[in-house]
A protein has these predicted regions:
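Local beta-strand N-terminus motif with an aromatic residue
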Residues: 43-44
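Short catalytic micro-motifs in class I SAM-dependent methyltransferases
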Residues: 50-54
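Adenosine-cofactor binding site in Rossmann-like domains, unifying the SAM/SAH pocket
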Residues: 10-40, 143-144, 148-165
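S-adenosyl-L-methionine-dependent methyltransferase catalytic module, highlighting the catalytic core
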Residues: 59-66, 72, 76-178
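A conserved beta-strand element that flanks and buttresses the S-adenosyl-L-methionine
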Residues: 47
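Conserved class I S-adenosyl-L-methionine
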Residues: 2-9
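Residues at the starts of beta-strands that form the adenosine-phosphate
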Residues: 2, 16, 138
Length: 179
């Protein structure tokens, strides 16, 4: 089974995953997030946690098209992005302060000499619409605890209060779709 972790950063999911990121990490197998080195219909699973929001909408369509190309029919795409809807609700209800959501919504990352920032936000409706427009089907919100990567603590497991996975509110929008 071919499983790709695209935008993995420093997180190493082990030998059963191919690690892809534009950064400079020892465990990387490839750097091209557009997966040009992969044959069409050759990948079973693409997972990307909190990388997709660094793209604007046009870049997102291009990337989804590239990922669609390499996924096998019935292949799975699993995306995790900051959940704009949940964070907005928490803020409007007075459950969190603006300072608590600035990082998740407007995050930044150092990529060598360059600093990159989030370029967009998503709620379930906007992300599922985008996925459907790019050819994906059967879009739904997945439960991170039920995945084969649940033991790897990444931002798909982001909660407010921070790390309160039992009583907190999940602020990551975790969506799965099929080719």
């Amino acid at each position: 089974m071919t499983k790709l972790n695209v935008g993995c950063g420093w997180r190493n999911f082990g030998q059963e995953w191919t690690h892809i990121d534009g950064g400079d990490y020892d465990h990387l197998d490839h750097k091209d997030i557009f997966l040009q080195e992969h044959e069409p219909s050759s990948v079973d699973v693409i997972y990307s946690s909190h990388m997709f929001e660094y793209l604007d909408r046009e870049e997102a369509v291009g990337l989804l098209s590239a990922w669609y190309r390499v996924l096998k029919p019935g292949g799975i795409l699993r995306l995790a992005v900051p959940d704009f809807s949940t964070m907005s609700w928490l803020y409007q209800e007075g459950k969190i302060t603006l300072d608590q959501i600035l990082g998740p919504l407007y995050g930044k990352m150092q990529m060598g000499e360059e600093v990159v920032y989030h370029k967009t936000v998503y709620d379930y409706a906007s992300l599922s619409k985008l996925l459907t427009e790019c050819g994906f089907r059967d879009v739904f919100e997945y439960e991170w605890r039920e995945t084969d990567h649940a033991e790897h603590d990444d931002h798909s497991q982001a909660y407010i209060p921070h790390m309160d996975k039992d009583n907190g509110v999940l602020i990551s929008l975790n969506v799965e779709a099929k080719k």
